[in-house]
Amino acid sequence: MKILLPFYFVIFLSVSSALETPPWADSVTTGKGPGNFPFPSNARLTYRFGWSGITAAQADVHLTREGDMVKTEANGGTVGLARALFRLDLEHECLSHRSTLLPTRVVQDEKYASQDVKTTIDFSAKGTTSVRDVTPAKEPPKSRTIEFAPVFSFETAYFWVRSQPLTEGEKEVMVVYANNAAYLATVEIVGREKIRIGDTERNAIRVNLNFKSIDQHLQLKTYKRFKSGRGWISDDNYRIPLRVEADIFVGYVFAELEKFEPGAQKE
C-alpha cells in the first residue's frame, strides 16, 4: 500500500492543478460589468454567408426583449448551388439577461441531408454544460462541462462588446461557448473606417478577432481551424454587426448584413 502512495499523490496534484484558476483568467476583462452603451431595441436582421466571396447561405435574426429577458432567434440555411452540394437548415435560440448580458440557455438544431444535430447549452454561475444529440446516433449523447464563469454565447459576447466604449486600442477578452466547445476570445478595437455594405458606404468600427480553444481542464489550445478574423460594427446608435470575416484552413468565410429593420417584431 505504501508503494502506491506516491502515485496517489501525483494523481492528487494533477487533479488539483486542473481545478485551479487557469493563468489566462487574469486576462479576462468581463469582471468590470457591462458598459453604458444602450442595449439594442427589438429588431430583425438578415445576413448572407459565404466562402471566398461566394454567397452560400442566408439567415434571419430576430432580437426580442421582454423585461430583463432577451430572446435571440436565428433561422437559415444554405442556398443556391451550395444547397445542392451541402444541405443545411438551422434553427438557433438564445435566452439571456439584459441586465448582465449573460446567457442562460442556447438551443440549436442543425438539419443535414443525412442527420440531425441538436445542441443544448446551459449557462450558470458555476459553469457551462453542453449536450450534442445526433440522429441517427452511433452512441448515446455525452455532456461536456467547463467549470468557469462568466461564459458568453456568441450573441451575448457581441452584446457585451457593443456595450463598451470601443476606443481605439481597447481589448475585450472573454470566454465564449459555441456549438459544443469553449473558446477564449480576444476582440481588439482597431479604429474607425468606412466600409461598403451592398450599395451603401457605412461608418464602421473595425475589430480584430482571435480565438483559442479551451479544453475541459481549462487549458488553452491552438484553434487549428481558425487563423485570424476581423469584423465591422456600425458606428452609430445601433452598433449592429455589418460584416465578419474569418481566415480558416480552406480560405475565408464571411457574414454580411443585407437588411436591418429596427423595432421589427417576429411574425
Regions found by a protein language model. Name each.
Residues 119-164:
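Hydrophobic, well-structured mid-protein blocks that either form specific transmembrane helices
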Residues 1-5:
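Positively charged n-region of N-terminal signal peptides that target proteins for export
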Residues 14, 37, 76, 148-150:
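Alpha-helical interaction segments
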Residues 6-16:
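Bacterial N-terminal signal peptides
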Residues 21-125, 166-267:
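Acidic, serine/threonine-rich low-complexity disordered tracts
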Residues 8-9, 48, 159, 178:
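Compositionally biased, intrinsically disordered low-complexity regions enriched in proline and serine
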